[in-house]
């Protein structure tokens, strides 16, 4: 009779275990998918947050940590998710509208008049005449808290599932499986350029399912989830006149079809210009080459081809082949469809959807001209690393790659609105070091010396050892450029003398002449290990320090509020493992960006690989009951030490296996050892919810420590990770507890 009576209870237990197993998978999917969605959406609508996407990343980790710690609370935090999310969305949209419709509102990003770090697009409103100035640190702190609160509910579900599921490592494996599904699903939507409303429809479906499983789903919550999806869909379908919005894999793109304007994440990015009407600076390098006695460039490489302006001008001046490299498929498609000169339809153009640095490293072609065409991405490459999409184009090693693909008499040209003289000095110094010849620097409007550049100063840096252009300037002193491109075809800018022309013929002429640039042997180069072109020196900017302090205080406050009452119970081993692993992920992201490009696809592949390595580590711990942590720590320390001490330049030459395989091993190898250490430690932890919450809290600290890369470089950042791992050894069982 006892056995018969026990059967329903056993069946209920098995059913509950199966439900928790499925919940672990679903919440793994939800957290990863929601994290990526928040990074993309809030970067698009919160003014200038695209330069600080790690705020959304760290907030998601903090919220998950707090949720795990609240696993034993009676309050159901997932029920609050739609209301918190809707509030965060409405606040973001209100700020977006206020910033773009009220000239008196300015968001200050580190004082861009004399900055320690330059952020393109943040300086167009003058703080001196503004009525209301908000520091970016305040905005970052506000959304740090709001996004963190969004993740408390999913984190609580995760903690409760870990508490209930009998086999923790198997449960963690199921959770990682859900995360893998989440990254695949979001990557598929990014490839399809799906709108944000669809992202959050999937999020709300997952939240609704978890609420239904818990028996807490009611009409009010269903209505709130529907309102959230509708609220997130409305901004995507706002169309003013001929405006169209596209969610590319990198940005929210605002395209004014009639005006030819392209904005990304609320910041002006580029204009589509007809050769017949405007854009003479794009012709300048071709005119200088032609009138200094050079033959038209035959083979041209344009990196940052965008909508096609630079490609158009290369074709107009006789190029027989133009390789047009653009990283963003949506911007490239806009150029194909809407550029009035149809450059992408020309059979001489070979479009490449690729990262510029990866193309330079992988191509065997040789070029007469390599052009960096207004390369400024206006966004970070990843929330895991403080680098931008173009960071690895402007390093000393990248310029060596350019030199390799140039023909003996080839020219390398870079142009942009660089904002600060020290950026121009750094680029010019790196170019001279790479090519052995001093570059020619031109400024439009003309500046005798590159110093205190105005915001509208277009600077061109001509590198390489082709001396024709420099000799022509030495002979003629000036070059005259007409602002209407077709008119330049009929004049020689070197021999033209404006004083001999009628006033109406000189109205559109601009004087071009070399500008003096002050740099010396002590000028700091950007390198593949320290790829911070826009950072004035090896320093952490003041506003970044303020932000770190503010986020740190807010994070500690939230953890304190969500910890079980009456005690402080962080599992210190798990905490330090989380901090260290975050830095391993950072190193992996930047290493793969150098090797394979800074594309969204490479980024997705990196995180997919990391999750696979964690999965393999879990399977190992499931199979091997007695895991000796000592040997795994020794292996981890050795491979981390090798990664931190072996110079990255060692891998720049040699066979494919050496150039690609060895760096991948050093970047990804530690994660297998670290995964085994984590899985074994998690299996033996007395309280899985607090252990996992402590680990995620450590990830927040690791994310803040990533800012040390601006001081140390990414290679020596591994020493910080090594320190965290040593601290995890120091406290092997480790709970800091006080009753």
Role assignments for model-derived ranges:
Residues 2-739:
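Alpha-helical transmembrane segments of multi-pass membrane proteins
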């Amino acid at each position: 009779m006892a056995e018969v009576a026990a059967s329903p209870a056993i069946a209920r237990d098995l059913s509950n275990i199966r439900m928790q197993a499925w919940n672990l998978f679903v919440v793994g999917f939800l957290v990863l998918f929601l994290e990526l969605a928040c990074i993309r959406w809030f970067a698009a609508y919160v003014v200038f947050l695209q330069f600080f996407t790690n705020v959304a990343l760290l907030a998601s980790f903090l919220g998950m940590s707090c949720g795990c710690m609240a696993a034993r609370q009676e309050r159901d935090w997932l029920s609050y998710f739609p209301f918190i999310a809707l509030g965060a969305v409405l606040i973001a949209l209100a700020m977006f509208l206020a910033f773009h419709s009220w000239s008196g509102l300015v968001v200050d990003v580190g004082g861009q008049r004399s900055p320690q770090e330059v952020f393109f697009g943040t300086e167009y409103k003058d703080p001196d005449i503004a009525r209301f100035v908000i520091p970016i640190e305040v905005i970052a702190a506000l959304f740090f808290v709001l996004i963190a609160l969004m993740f408390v509910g999913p984190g609580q579900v995760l903690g409760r599932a870990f508490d209930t599921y009998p086999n923790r490592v198997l449960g963690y494996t199921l959770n990682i499986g859900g995360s893998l599904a989440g990254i695949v699903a979001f990557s598929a939507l990014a490839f399809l350029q799906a709108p944000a409303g669809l992202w959050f429809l999937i999020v709300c479906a997952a939240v609704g399912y978890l609420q239904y499983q818990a028996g807490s789903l009611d009409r009010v919550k269903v209505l709130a989830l529907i309102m959230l999806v509708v609220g997130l869909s409305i901004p995507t379908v706002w169309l003013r006149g001929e405006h169209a919005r596209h969610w590319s894999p990198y940005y929210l793109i605002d395209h004014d079809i009639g005006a030819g304007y392209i904005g990304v994440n609320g910041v002006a990015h580029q204009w589509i210009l007809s050769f017949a009407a405007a854009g003479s600076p794009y012709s300048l390098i071709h005119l200088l080459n032609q009138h200094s006695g050079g033959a038209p460039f035959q083979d041209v490489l344009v990196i940052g081809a965008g909508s096609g302006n630079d490609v158009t001008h290369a074709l107009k001046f006789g190029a027989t082949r133009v390789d047009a490299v653009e990283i963003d498929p949506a911007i490239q498609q806009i150029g194909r469809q809407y550029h009035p000169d149809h450059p992408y339809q020309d059979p001489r153009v070979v479009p490449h959807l690729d990262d510029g640095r990866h193309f330079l490293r992988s191509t065997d072609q040789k070029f007469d001209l390599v052009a960096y065409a207004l390369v400024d991405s206006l966004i970070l490459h990843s929330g895991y690393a403080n680098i931008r999409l173009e960071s690895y184009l402007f390093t000393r090693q990248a310029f060596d790659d350019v030199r390799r693909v140039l023909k003996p008499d080839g020219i390398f040209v870079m142009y942009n609105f660089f904002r600060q003289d020290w950026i121009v000095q750094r680029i010019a110094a790196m170019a001279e070091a790479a090519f052995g010849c001093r570059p020619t620097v031109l400024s439009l409007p003309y500046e005798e010396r590159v110093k205190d550049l105005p915001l509208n100063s277009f600077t061109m840096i001509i590198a390489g050892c082709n001396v024709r252009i420099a000799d022509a300037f030495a002979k003629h002193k000036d070059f005259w450029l007409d602002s209407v491109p077709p008119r330049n075809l009929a004049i020689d800018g070197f021999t033209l003398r404006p004083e001999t022309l009628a006033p109406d013929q000189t109205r559109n002429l601009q004087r071009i002449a070399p500008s003096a640039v002050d740099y010396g042997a002590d000028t700091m180069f950007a390198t593949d290990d320290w790829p911070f072109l826009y950072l004035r020196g090896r320093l952490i900017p003041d506003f970044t320090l303020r932000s770190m302090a503010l986020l740190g205080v807010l994070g500690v406050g939230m953890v304190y509020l969500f910890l079980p009452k009456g005690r402080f119970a962080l599992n210190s081993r798990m905490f330090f493992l989380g901090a260290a692993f975050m830095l391993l992920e950072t190193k992996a992201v930047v290493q793969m960006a150098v090797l394979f490009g800074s594309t969204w696809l490479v980024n997705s592949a990196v995180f997919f690989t990391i999750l696979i390595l964690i999965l393999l580590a879990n399977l190992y711990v499931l199979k091997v009951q007695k895991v000796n942590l000592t040997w795994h720590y020794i292996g981890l320390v050795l491979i981390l030490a090798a990664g931190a001490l072996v110079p990255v330049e060692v891998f720049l030459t040699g066979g494919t296996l050496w150039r690609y395989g060895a760096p991948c091993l050093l970047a990804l190898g530690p994660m297998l050892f670290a995964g085994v250490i984590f899985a074994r430690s998690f299996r033996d932890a007395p309280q899985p919810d607090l252990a996992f919450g402590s680990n995620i809290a450590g990830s927040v600290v690791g994310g803040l420590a990533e800012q040390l890369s601006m001081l140390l470089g990414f290679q020596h950042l591994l020493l910080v990770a090594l320190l965290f791992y040593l601290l995890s050894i120091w406290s092997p069982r480790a709970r800091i507890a006080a009753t």
